[in-house]
Amino acid sequence: MPDCYIALGGNQGPVRETFSLALERLDQHPDISVIKTSHWIETAPVGDQTTDPFLNGAAHLSISLSPESLLLELQQLEADMGRVREIRWGARPLDLDLLLYDQLIIRSQNLVVPHPACWYRRFVLDPLSEIAADVIHPEKQTTIQELRQRLLIKPFQFVLAGLSPKEAALLIENLQHKYPEVQFSSWETQGSAASITPEPTLIVWLGAPSSTIKFEDLPLIPRLDLSDYQNNTERIVHVLQSALDFQ
């Protein structure tokens, strides 16, 4: 049976009780077995849509459902627990994300696996590393524990790619005052990862029309494609909140 890992989150109502009920419901499903769960950890919210802290955790499932069928089960369980999908990063009683489904890589209209943000979000990686430390991330080709450890290295090296040096400098100026502990730089200015020491923690590709750099040219582990987002500053702040402002 395939091994799957899911993330649990919530900040409305009795979240611990909601987690317990959700896991009980999953374990009662004839095609789902809950193998192991992490500790629950309290984390700061991302964005400014809510100020209430979240409870987060992870669970290891053994299933005989397809990825798409499992997603539907998770979404139905969220709805049954009162989840309403209206505001991104908003308050919610229960959030269930499918992180990994064996070593499958899925890119469909309704489902992306591995979860595209699971490799750099501390509120996902910390609990997930408790129960899946040696599991290989199928895209990054390194373990969950190693992905988490990369985020702990100081100074935190954050590289912007896919912008002209002038565009990158303006964006860095906007970001530096908010995150003075982060070392920001431009890929186009540096020239390559070899000139950035230590290895960048994250390389965010913004894919401006003026860029001569392709996303596929960037190092595999730290690269993150944000080219589809309109507000670069806001999106990068959300990424940094997820990677840095853990608790």
Locations of regions flagged by a protein language model:
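Flexible, gly/pro- and Lys/Arg-enriched active-site loops
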Residues: 38, 46, 53, 71, ...
